C-alpha cells in the first residue's frame, strides 16, 4: 500500500517536472526579437561575441564580456558620442592587476530600436582593439560588461548564439 502511494507521488512529481520544463522552453521561445542580440556572424568571423549597438546613426561594436565588471567605451571615440560625464572618477584594474583612474560617463545606446542607458568607463582600448581591426577587419568601440547584463537581466546563450533579456 505505501509502495503504491510512493509510486503514484513519484509519477505526479515527474509529470509536474516535465510540465515545468516544457513551460520554460515555451517561455524561452517567446523572447521578442528586439530582446535577442545575435552574435552569430561575429562569432563565426572573430570567435568573439560582438554586438552592434547604435547611438543615433553611428554604429558601435561592443564585445560582450561577462568577465568585465563594468562596461567600457574606448577613449578615442568618446568625443564623437553623446554622453553625460559622471561627477566622479573611478578605478579600473587591468588583466595584469595595474590600477588606473578613469572617467565615467552615462550614455544612451540602442539595439534594434530598444533603448539602453548605462554607465561606461572611459578607457584607452586602441592597442587591444587595433589587433582586432588588423586581424579581422572589425572595429570595436567598447565592452559590455556584467553590470549591463545584471541591470537589464540579459543572459548569453551559446547554443543559440544570442544574448537575451529575461525581463
What is the predicted function of each stretch?
Residues 1-167:
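Pepsin/retropepsin-fold aspartyl endopeptidases
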Amino acid at each position: 500500500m505505501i509502495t503504491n502511494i510512493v509510486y503514484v507521488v513519484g509519477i505526479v512529481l515527474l509529470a509536474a517536472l516535465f510540465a515545468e520544463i516544457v513551460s520554460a522552453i515555451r517561455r524561452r521561445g517567446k523572447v521578442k526579437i528586439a530582446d535577442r542580440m545575435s552574435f552569430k556572424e561575429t562569432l563565426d568571423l572573430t570567435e568573439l561575441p560582438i554586438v552592434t549597438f547604435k547611438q543615433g546613426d553611428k554604429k558601435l561594436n561592443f564585445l560582450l564580456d561577462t568577465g568585465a565588471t563594468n562596461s567600457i567605451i574606448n577613449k578615442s571615440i568618446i568625443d564623437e558620442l553623446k554622453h553625460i560625464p559622471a561627477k566622479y572618477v573611478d578605478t579600473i584594474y587591468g588583466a595584469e592587476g595595474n590600477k588606473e583612474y578613469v572617467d565615467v560617463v552615462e550614455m544612451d545606446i540602442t539595439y534594434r530600436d530598444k533603448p539602453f542607458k548605462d554607465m561606461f568607463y572611459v578607457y584607452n582600448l586602441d592597442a587591444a582593439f587595433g589587433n582586432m581591426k588588423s586581424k579581422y577587419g572589425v572595429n570595436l568601440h567598447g565592452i559590455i560588461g556584467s553590470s549591463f547584463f545584471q541591470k537589464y537581466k540579459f543572459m548569453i546563450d551559446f547554443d543559440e548564439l544570442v544574448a537575451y533579456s529575461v525581463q
